[in-house]
Amino acid sequence: MSWIAGAMQGAGLLGDLAGTIGQIVLHNKQLNIMNSFNQAQIQLAKDQLKQNQQLANQYYEFNANLPVNQYNSAVSAGFDSVSARQLAGSREVRYLGGQQTPLVHQGQIHQMMFSPKHLMQAQHVVGTFSRGMPGVTPSKGLPRPQGVTAKVPVAGATTTHSKV
């Protein structure tokens, strides 16, 4: 019977060895799977970092060229150069007739400008009021009224000169 007990112990040993070898193989496969998973995560992180860096570079390039892009877009949309610069962030101000004008489309600027003819007419009207019409009123303005002028005494004023 001892040889049966020895054979059983030998079979148990072989079963334990097979189980241990199976666990070692399984553990090695799990390590390989974890290693490939970690490598994939590292590669994804590298790709994400690369993409973030590209997006940051695009953002900086876009912001560096933003005023130029805004100006070009405004001009192509029909705004004049001053209004386009104002849209791009310029603090430039345009005054027309003593008033600050809002953003102006190129079609509106022509409507707002005064023609030289109107300015000359306005100057002629002011000149007519101050000088009169040639041939109708005297050239030196309106005549002074004729008549007696009243002398009004001023309190505290004397007519004699005193020497000090």
Swiss-Prot record:
Tagged with keyword Acetylation: no
Stored InterPro entries: Minor_structural_calicivir
Keyword NAD: no
Keywords: Capsid decoration protein, Capsid protein, Host cytoplasm, Virion
Compartments where found: Virion; Host cytoplasm
Gene Ontology cellular component terms for the protein in this record: host cell cytoplasm; viral capsid, decoration
Segments forming a coiled coil: none
Predominant place of localization: virion
Domain of life: Viruses
Function: Minor structural protein that forms a portal-like structure at a unique three-fold axis of symmetry, following binding to the host receptor. The channel formed by VP2 may allow the delivery of the viral genome through the host endosomal membrane.
Family: Belongs to the sapovirus VP2 family.
Miscellaneous remark of the record: Translated by a ribosomal termination-reinitiation process from the bicistronic mRNA coding for VP1 and VP2.
The protein's assembly and partners: Homooligomer. The portal-like structure consists in 12 copies of VP2. Interacts with capsid protein VP1.
Domain writeup: The N-terminus domain points away from the virion surface.
Protein name as it appears in the record: Minor capsid protein VP2
